UniProtKB/Swiss-Prot annotation:
Belongs to the ABC transporter superfamily. sn-glycerol-3-phosphate importer (TC 3.A.1.1.3) family. GO terms for molecular function: ABC-type glycerol-3-phosphate transporter activity; ATP binding; ATP hydrolysis activity. SMART domains: AAA (SM00382). It is found in: Cell inner membrane. One of its GO terms (biological process) is carbohydrate transport. Residues 4-235 form the ABC transporter domain. It catalyses: sn-glycerol 3-phosphate(out) + ATP + H2O = sn-glycerol 3-phosphate(in) + ADP + phosphate + H(+). The lineage of its organism: Bacteria, Pseudomonadati, Pseudomonadota, Alphaproteobacteria, Hyphomicrobiales. Pfam families: ABC_tran (PF00005). The gene is ugpC. Its EC number is 7.6.2.10. This is sn-glycerol-3-phosphate import ATP-binding protein UgpC. It comes from Rhodopseudomonas palustris (strain HaA2). The keyword Flavoprotein does not apply. InterPro entries: AAA+_ATPase, ABC_transporter-like_ATP-bd, ABC_transporter-like_CS, ABC_transpr_MalK-like, ABC_transpr_MalK/UgpC-like, Mo/tungstate-bd_C_term_dom, P-loop_NTPase.
Length: 364
């Protein structure tokens, strides 16, 4: 096992495009770190730099106290699991798992012991004679993980390994991956664009956007105290509601002091709706119900703020002006009708305040 430290890591491609813009973070020994962000944010590029599949322009990558910038991937003591499984179609499951060990000249008895142990852990012992084409997607992914396990690396690297699986199987496999990592105690770095996957897997969450790290913390810390409006809107489903604090149709007070300009955020589950206005500190909104989504135990209410002639709005990307919708999460049966006029309120302790450009959280 080993810790992984990135110090001011940068990647600039020929032509001047800067894909990674000075990334710093540390993954502790045995921790499960998830890099999460939208497509094109640089998360897979960063993982490939840790693996040695992509060169770095500047900075240092430290694995277990050793700077690996100039070290070949095969010598970094890491194992990588890919999205497309990367299995040899003409080889059996056993030979796929044993192939890398044979190339390293490992004795046959040790190879067999490692393969059998990995197969036992992953519950694929009855499949060792099968070819990949005879396996389901989930079984193939287990074989890919088994191939990584037999190497007994210091660090596991996962590049969106569940993207090709259906929704039900993704849930099952992410539980298996987390259980496996805890059992082995091996440091892991995992890339995904799925914020739910990230929240459920991570010890430490690294939220990326356009080549920079927006926030680092535990999943609960990032969800409860987002550092920027990007994080607030990306982490959480449905996302946090964001609005200009001084826009028409937004009334917010904190104790006896009214706030000034800025961006106000509130999670959908922290809004309470009623048919009559409530006199309370915090946030008060007038809404017209535009759409309703019933998803079993809960219902999402989409409303539009009641206001006239106000062009202001807020975006997770400064400079953009999205529709001025508000989302409220309520228990499954508690929903008004489309077209109803409602009032939504939130207590001060449930509100989040950001600077006007969305780049800084302001503590209340």
């Amino acid at each position: 096992m080993a810790n992984v430290v990135l110090r001011n890591v940068r990647k600039t491609y020929p032509g001047g495009f800067e894909a990674i813009k000075g990334v710093d973070f540390e993954v502790g020994d045995g921790q499960f770190c998830v890099l999460v962000g939208p497509s094109g944010c640089g998360k897979s590029t960063l993982l490939r730099m840790v693996a040695g599949l992509e060169t770095i322009t500047a900075g240092e990558i430290d694995i277990g106290g050793r700077i690996v910038n100039q070290i070949e991937p095969a010598d970094r003591d890491i194992a990588m699991v890919f999205q497309n499984y990367a299995l040899y179609p003409h080889m059996s499951v056993y030979n796929n798992m044993a192939y890398g060990l044979r190339n390293r000249g490992m004795p046959k008895p040790e190879i067999d012991a490692r393969v059998q142990e990995a197969a036992r852990i992953l519950e694929i012992g009855t499949m060792l004679d099968r070819k990949p084409r005879q396996l389901s997607g989930g079984q193939r992914q287990r074989v890919a993980m088994g191939r990584a396990i037999v190497r007994q690396p210091k660090v596991f690297l996962f590049d969106e390994p569940l993207s090709n699986l259906d929704a039900k199987l993704r849930v099952a496999m992410r539980v298996e991956i987390r259980k496996l990592q805890r059992r082995l105690g091996t440091t892991a770095i995992y890339v995904t664009h799925d914020q739910l996957e990230a929240m459920t897997l991570a010890d430490i969450l690294v939220v990326m956007n356009a080549g920079v790290v927006e926030q680092i913390g535990s999943p609960l810390e990032v969800y409860a105290r987002p550092a920027t409006t990007f994080v607030a809107s990306f982490i959480g489903a449905p996302p946090m509601n964001l609005m200009l604090l001084d826009a028409e149709g937004v009334r917010a007070r904190f104790g006896n002091a009214a706030t000034g300009a800025g961006i106000l955020g509130v999670r959908p589950e922290d809004l309470v709706i009623s048919r009559e206005p409530a006199a309370t500190d915090g946030l008060s909104l007038d809404l017209t119900v535009e759409a309703i989504e019933r998803v079993g135990p809960e219902t999402f209410i989409y409303g539009t703020r009641s206001r006239a002639g106000d062009p202001t709005a807020v975006s997770s990307k400064p400079g953009e002006l999205p529709p001025d919708d508000i989302i409220v999460r309520v228990p499954g049966q508690d929903a008004p009708a489309i077209g109803d006029h409602m009032f939504a309120t939130a207590l001060p302790q449930h509100l989040h305040l950001f600077s006007a450009d969305g780049r800084r959280r302001i503590e209340l």
